[in-house]
Regions:
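PRPP-associated nucleotide enzymes
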Residues: 1-550
């Protein structure tokens, strides 16, 4: 089999070898690519500064590590939502078809027995006729395959209509993902479809990378859906409803706070959303904890990429048998990975809060600083008056946005969030200098900044700060060319990173913070950004009261 050597890509070859850095290469073999999405459209690769895994798939459709058109990650979540929509309606169609078939068998059996009984009665065999009728009744009562009707009022014809709709919309989504210039048009069509699943569903997005992916997937549905994302925020006033570990991550603990006791306690299917499934261990840990507290029968795992091995898949099957549940998987690309070598990374080249990473290489330390505007913006969104405790034990009493997804939301909350995001976008658009702009989400706070960026006009890119340390190399095809590091504004004990932002690439850089933080904590981030923005840096702290600038 012919291999494609990174960065070249041949869409007809299912195996691709990525030579990431010296002494490290990864071979990716596609096993399922149902929409024929080019690998090069989904991700590039980079070396990772993490002892648990030495490389990273740098997503081009997620809006996390590198700048993207904000409509692309919104569309990615919606595309996964369509896969779920198709699956749920296919399941319903199977149930309805089986139910109809079972009813037909029962009716035929009853009719046959009645005819036999009538003939026997004419022949004077009344006793045998009674036996025949009893047998017919027994046949009519015997259940056919999959006859539990959990969706009353929905017909087989309606299911077929919904599946035809899903097929059409999936074509639109694939076009938008394959050709980013159509992402906005595709997402607008999908969002306007106002889809409804045949039964309620709860979505759970994994922090920090998949908080927006899960929210975008949930947002596709007009009614009957709920969403919550896990968090690494320590909120003293609240207790975590579920807790588990992400074993291969640089930050392993996941917490889950919900204000609505019924959000997790129902029996509806749960959709676990992550950008990438490597081993599936995090999913296993999640399901085990959920089943011990909020048991149910159906789980769906949705991801952009799925790299599980045969042994990993067997672990899912074993868990299904052990707990008496079903686990289904949905993804845009499925395959296997084979790693060769160990990177010999120089510690001095890694991004650090002491020296940024791109400073000397790009000359950003020698250019004039861009002016900084700090705004406290009244966004119209409800607040939750709880505090957070950082890794140093310090308390921030500024309230959180109630509808961010961290505390649970339902379909009925979408309209209010959309209106608030659009209102913020209009105000920020008025601050633009007119050229290219970048909107930065911060950590777990990804979806609302992404949604705001999408409504700020043409020429706006989006990405988020991240905890994930990536080794930068400025060479063609490599995933991360430049890196900057600084202590997080929310927790100075945690280092945050920014990737692939060149000096003067954007006239305006907008940083959106979910809540107020002390001004001195923002300064390390400003020391990085004011060397990158061409004209101005805008730091927007949402919910800070009447808008003002300093």
């Amino acid at each position: 089999m012919k291999n494609s050597i990174f960065p070249d890509y041949c869409p007809n070859t299912p195996t691709h070898t990525f030579k990431i850095v010296d002494h490290l290469s990864v071979q990716v073999t596609e096993t399922a690519n149902p929409f024929s999405l080019p690998v090069s459209a989904l991700f590039s690769m980079a070396a990772r500064i993490n002892k648990k895994r030495s490389f990273l798939f740098v997503s081009k459709v997620l809006g996390k590590h590198i700048p993207v058109d904000p409509y692309t990650p919104l569309l990615t979540g919606a595309a996964l939502g369509l896969l779920l929509y198709r699956r749920q309606w296919e399941r319903l169609k199977e149930v309805e078809a089986a139910q109809m078939q079972g009813s037909l068998y029962a009716a035929e059996a009853a009719s046959g027995q009645e005819q036999a009984g009538g003939q026997a009665e004419l022949a004077g065999q009344a006793g045998d006729a009674g036996n025949a009728r009893n047998a017919g009744e027994a046949s009519a009562e015997a259940p056919g395959p999959a006859t539990d009707h959990i969706h009353p009022g929905v017909t087989l014809g309606e299911a077929e209509e919904r599946l035809a709709e899903a097929a059409r919309l999936l074509e639109t989504a694939v076009r938008g993902l394959s050709q980013p210039e159509f992402a906005r048009e595709a997402y607008t069509e999908l969002a306007g479809a106002k889809l409804v699943l045949p039964e309620p569903v709860l979505f759970i997005g994994y922090a920090e990378t998949a908080t927006a992916l899960g929210h975008s997937m949930f947002r596709l549905f007009h009614d009957g859906a709920a969403y919550i994302h896990t968090t690494r925020e320590d909120i003293p006033e609240l207790s975590s409803a579920i807790s588990f570990e992400e074993e291969h991550s640089h930050a392993v603990d996941h917490l889950c706070y919900t204000l609505d006791p019924e959000l997790l306690s129902g029996g509806e299917p749960v959709v676990l959303v992550d950008d990438e499934i490597t081993t599936g261990n995090t999913v296993v840990n999640t399901i085990r904890d959920m089943q011990s507290k909020f048991p149910r029968s159906d789980y769906v795992v949705a991801s952009i990429l799925d790299w599980r091995t045969g042994a990993n898949r067997e672990a899912y099957a074993a868990l299904e048998q052990e707990l008496g549940i079903r686990i289904a998987s949905l993804c845009l690309l499925e395959g296997s990975i084979e790693v060769s070598g160990t990177p010999l990374l120089e510690a001095s080249a890694a991004p650090s809060a002491a020296h940024g990473a791109a400073g000397e290489a790009t000359g950003s330390a020698r250019r004039a600083s861009a002016p900084v505007n700090l705004s406290l913006l009244q966004d119209g969104m409800d607040r939750l008056p709880v505090s957070s405790r950082d890794s140093l034990g310090e308390i921030n009493a500024a309230p959180y946005i109630r509808g961010s997804g961290r505390f649970g939301i339902r379909s009925g909350d979408n309209e209010e969030l959309d209106l608030a995001a659009s209102a913020v976008a209009m105000r920020l658009q008025a601050l633009r200098e007119g050229g290219p702009a970048l909107v930065l989400g911060t950590g777990e706070f990804m979806y609302l900044p992404m949604r705001i960026a999408a409504a700020m006009g043409e020429g706006v890119s989006y990405q988020s700060t991240t905890r994930s340390p990536i080794y930068p190399v400025d060479k063609p095809g490599y995933g991360v060319a430049s890196a900057e590091a600084y202590p997080s504004a929310g927790d100075p004990g945690i280092i945050n990173y920014l990737y692939n932002i060149a000096p003067d690439q954007y006239d305006d850089i907008f940083v959106l913070l979910e809540r107020e933080v002390p001004i001195p904590r923002i300064q390390p981030m400003l020391d990085v950004l004011d060397k990158l923005a061409g004209r101005r840096v805008h730091v927007i702290m949402l919910g800070g009261g009447p808008g003002k600038e300093e």
